[in-house]
Amino acid sequence: MSALTVEACGPGTTVQDAGRTGFRRFGVSTAGAMDRLALALANVLVGNHPGTAAVEFTLVGGRFRTVDTTVAVAAVGAFLTVDGRPIPAGSGALAGPGASIAVGPARGGVYAYLAVGGGIDSPPAMGSRSVHRRSAIGGGPLGPGDMLPLGPDGADVPRRLPLPEPTTGPIRLMFGPQDDPFTDAALAALTATDWTVMPRSDRMGCRLDGAVLPHARGFNIVSDGVVPGSVQVPGDGRPIVLMRDCQTTGGYPKIATVIGPDLDRLAQVPPGGTVRFAAVARTEAVAAAAALRQRIDGLAALARPAGADPSSEDLLALNLIGGVVDATAVG
């Protein structure tokens, strides 16, 4: 059987794919990868569909071993080695039977991904292999000794891709659906404050500190639907942005909603990091979501075999002139 054995990993390591859609009306959370573009990049590097199940790491990496198989592997967001051999960022590699696969801590963010050719073939639950920890739907966190079955065609030719530059700028949101219970001062403070991500943030919610957002009419409402991206404000006035593992209903007013593509960016801000929000119109939010889908769908066409020479298009897409100095000014 093609499989990976877990030898070591951090407590926040789970299997995630594109998420569990269509079941929120039954009280089932979406789950899924916290950074969908990073998941897609890792999968395309090993020849998988962008939304295929992979291993998601939270801050801490892990160590794995292949069982009776040769598979393509790739990591995005962390340093990867196969039998001690460093694998360049943006490139997949083949791992033979019994190979040791090591993933380092997350670099420049919170979440990193290990994709394996053929994908993680754990039993699907409601159309997804994503783990939702609080309900145990899809299983639970990974630990030493766990064995991850792999799908077929895992030894596909590994690929390489120029990794995109990190997107900068404020996190975009739309006011509402319940911005009316807040004072004008609260609405202004939401986009004028440098917010700090608190250590208690997790896959369920990103807790922020930096200002108190006053309620105009109390903080309790009749519970209604929430979605990933909803910005709830409880009684202490400090906002909580709901993330992929969030519940399906809530009883705090929702001052705003973070747009989908920027929720992935927010997920990668580490505890102690700062974020700023900017309000956008619905048309911009819809356009941003469409652009992310188009970007993910187009990744496979950009991929090249990992050992091939770079094309002229690849070279033009990369910044190859780093560290230039003026020699005449030295000495």
What function would you assign to each model-found segment?
Residues 1-331:
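Conserved "landmark" site that anchors the functional core of diverse proteins
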